[in-house]
C-alpha cells in the first residue's frame, strides 16, 4: 500500500521532533559536541550531479548516513547516531533498521524515541541480538532530564 503524502509528512514531522529532542538533550550535556551529519544536508546537491554507477553507490551510502556525530571532548571519540521515532518498538523492526544502517555505517548507533522512553544501541549489536534494544543510559544525562524531554515528545506527538 502506498503511503499517502499526509501520512508521510506526519512521520517526517515525528522524526524531526525526535531529532530535535535528541540534539537538545546532547547539546545540554557538558563535555560533548553534537554535529548534524545526516544525508538531508548533502543529498539534494549530489542528486543533481551526473550519475554513474559509482556515483549512485556513493549517493546510496550518503543516503544512509546517520543523523548526528557526537564528539566526546575529553577522549575525542566520535559516535555516529541515527535517530528514529517509533510509536511501538519491535525487535524485528529495530533489527531491520539496524541492518540498513550497518550496510554503510558499521560503527553507527541507533537512538530510538518512543512514547515510553529513549532507547540506544550499537547497530552491529542490534543486528547480532535480534533487534533487542536497551533503555538509554548516560552518566551525564540524568533521568529527570530525560523525563522532561520525554514529556515534550508526548506533548507534541499524540498517541496513535
For each feature predicted by the language model, list its residue ranges.
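Nuclease catalytic cores
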Residues: 1-23, 27
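Short secondary-structure junctions
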Residues: 27-34
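Charged phosphate-binding loop/patch that engages nucleotide di/tri-phosphates or the phosphate backbone
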Residues: 142-160
Amino acid at each position: 500500500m502506498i503511503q499517502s503524502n499526509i501520512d508521510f509528512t506526519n512521520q517526517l514531522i515525528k522524526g524531526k521532533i525526535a531529532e530535535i529532542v535528541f540534539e537538545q538533550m546532547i547539546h545540554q550535556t557538558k563535555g560533548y559536541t553534537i554535529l548534524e551529519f545526516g544525508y538531508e544536508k548533502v543529498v539534494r546537491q549530489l542528486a543533481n550531479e551526473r550519475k554513474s554507477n559509482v556515483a549512485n553507490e556513493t549517493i546510496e551510502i550518503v543516503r544512509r548516513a546517520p543523523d548526528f556525530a557526537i564528539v566526546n571532548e575529553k577522549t575525542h571519540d566520535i559516535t555516529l547516531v541515527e535517530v528514529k521515532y517509533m510509536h511501538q518498538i519491535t525487535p524485528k523492526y529495530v533489527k531491520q533498521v539496524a541492518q540498513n544502517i550497518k550496510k554503510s555505517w558499521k560503527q553507527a548507533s541507533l537512538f530510538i524515541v518512543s512514547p515510553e522512553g529513549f532507547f540506544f544501541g550499537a547497530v552491529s549489536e542490534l543486528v547480532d541480538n535480534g533487534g533487542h534494544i536497551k533503555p538509554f543510559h548516560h552518566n551525564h544525562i540524568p533521568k529527570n532530564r530525560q523525563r522532561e524531554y520525554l514529556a515534550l515528545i508526548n506533548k507534541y506527538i499524540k498517541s496513535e
